[in-house]
Amino acid sequence: SGPRNVINLQRVQGYQKAINESEFNLNTDLIIFNEKLIEGEQLGMVRSKKLLKKYPLLNGVFATTDMLATGLIKVAKKQNIRVPEELKVIGFSNWAISMLYEPSISTVDQPGFEMGMKAAQLLFSKISATSTVSEKTVIIKTKVIPRESSKVN
């Protein structure tokens, strides 16, 4: 089954949209997500072992966090699967670990500073409002940061 929390759901929907707009076929089994958003690398390792066993010829995976991606790469290395030559990996968030990991992890940049600024602005406007403020959805653009883990040979 797919993700149940809104953060993972939106990340997966973005991935699905990108795949549907490309020449590739969508296989949602190839998405590693974390419902709790706290256990990272360890959960990535557990899910990756199952995924690589089910799909031994797998050549690419999207993980909904960079920490899940690190777990996937760790498992791939233990199974002598070369990243990115045999398996391409992309994470989400652009945490510092994605730049420092070997190989560096391609990721979708989540602009945390901009998100915090927008949240603070919304909070201050709600605090200073004289009437009830309605719920507001704010969409902040992300971008893909290509690194070594998805490098095309």
Name every feature range the model reports, one short phrase each.
Residues 1-153:
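Bacterial carbohydrate/catabolite-sensing allosteric modules
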